[in-house]
């Protein structure tokens, strides 16, 4: 039977019989292949697969022996409770292991954007929208007007409030941005802050004295806007700052009318909790309670129509 040499087994290269007797790579004289080489020298009648399986068995046996010794050592250490001091040491080690925290990798902070050239109005507006404070600071340091507006009469303050960029808002107000300026929709910065839903900006503007009951083109107050957009925290803070709970918009709707119509349960509960009037009628003569009944009747009618249509379809399919 033809046998394979260890060199052939490991490298996959065939060697001539003449050279194989005198050639033995240094890598095979020591290390993990040493045992296989010795076995081959002792019994050249064994096949390469026999040598390989023997080698694996030996390695596996050594590994199992090491594991058993390690386990035995751990058990001996655990069972060494000769005094209260030993017990105290074990308890302290367990506490340390439990309290060990994995340190989060330190993220390299991005280098601040360096603005060298002049900042035009378009860049200024874009910076307010994208929260680029260095661009805002450069524009203001170059004596730029913080109250400049676009074709919709919207200022950088309006944009920053709608996007929730608190630091930009603070910088603009510090530079003289007017809080009560209105855009083409006659919305103030507070209207836009309520649309954006950033409570910290709402708090900041109110602390600076902005009108909490300002009206836009539809006669809506910031509270109307907060209720319609579902900004519960902003609405609650406005109410706590004595915003008008029962203010009517152009359609005669109060914030409660809007909350009921839009089926905003949390808003309805909030407004009731703070004492909103449920008897006020809008221009259609409807109170918030009327809207609830109207919604229920509309839903009932919708389901009845759906049921009737299903019955008719099933009846026609029989023919």
From Swiss-Prot:
GO molecular function: RNA polymerase II-specific DNA-binding transcription factor binding
Compartments (UniProt record): Nucleus
Keywords recorded for this protein, A-Z: ANK repeat, Nucleus, Repeat
GO biological-process terms attached to the record: cellular response to growth factor stimulus; myoblast differentiation; negative regulation of apoptotic process; negative regulation of gene expression; positive regulation of gene expression; positive regulation of myoblast proliferation; post-embryonic development; regulation of cell cycle
Listed Gene3D superfamilies: Ankyrin repeat-containing domain (1.25.40.20)
GO cellular component, one term: cytoplasm
Residue numbers spanned by region Disordered: 1-26, 44-71
Basic and acidic residues bias locations: 59-71
Keyword Cell cycle: no
ANK repeats (start-end): 152-181, 185-214, 218-247, 251-280, 284-315
Name of one Pfam family that matches: Ank_2
Source domain of life: Eukaryota
Function: May act as a nuclear transcription factor that negatively regulates the expression of cardiac genes.
Protein name per the record: Ankyrin repeat domain-containing protein 1
Organism: Gallus gallus
């Amino acid at each position: 039977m033809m046998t394979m040499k260890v060199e052939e087994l490991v490298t996959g290269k065939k060697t001539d019989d003449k050279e194989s007797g005198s050639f033995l790579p240094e890598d095979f004289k020591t290390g993990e292949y040493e045992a296989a080489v010795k076995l081959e020298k002792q019994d050249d009648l064994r096949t390469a697969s026999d040598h390989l399986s023997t080698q694996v068995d030996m390695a596996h046996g050594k590994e199992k022996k090491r594991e058993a010794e390690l386990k035995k050592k751990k058990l001996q250490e655990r069972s060494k409770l000769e005094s209260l001091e030993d017990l105290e040491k074990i308890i302290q080690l367990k506490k340390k292991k439990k309290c060990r925290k994995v340190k989060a990798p330190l993220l390299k902070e991005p280098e601040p954007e360096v603005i060298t050239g002049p900042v035009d109005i378009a860049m200024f507006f874009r910076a307010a929208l994208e929260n680029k404070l260095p661009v805002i600071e450069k524009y203001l340091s170059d004596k730029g007007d913080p109250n400049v507006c676009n074709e919709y009469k919207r200022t950088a303050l309006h944009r920053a409030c709608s996007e929730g960029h608190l630091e930009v808002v603070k910088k603009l107000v510090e530079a003289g941005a007017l809080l009560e300026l209105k855009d083409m929709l006659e919305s103030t910065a507070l209207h836009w802050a309520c649309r954006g839903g950033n409570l910290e900006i709402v708090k900041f503007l109110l602390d600076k004295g902005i009108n909490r009951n300002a009206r836009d083109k539809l006669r809506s107050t910031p509270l109307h806007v907060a209720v319609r957009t579902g900004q519960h925290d902003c609405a609650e803070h406005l109410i706590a700052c004595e915003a008008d709970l029962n203010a009517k918009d152009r359609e005669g709707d109060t914030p409660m009318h809007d909350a009921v119509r839009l089926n905003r349960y949390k808003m309805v509960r909030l407004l009731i909790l703070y004492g909103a009037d449920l008897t006020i009628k809008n221009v259609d003569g409807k109170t918030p309670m009327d809207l609830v009944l109207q919604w229920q009747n509309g839903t009932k009618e919708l389901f009845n129509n759906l049921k009737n249509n299903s019955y008719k379809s099933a009846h026609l399919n029989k023919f």
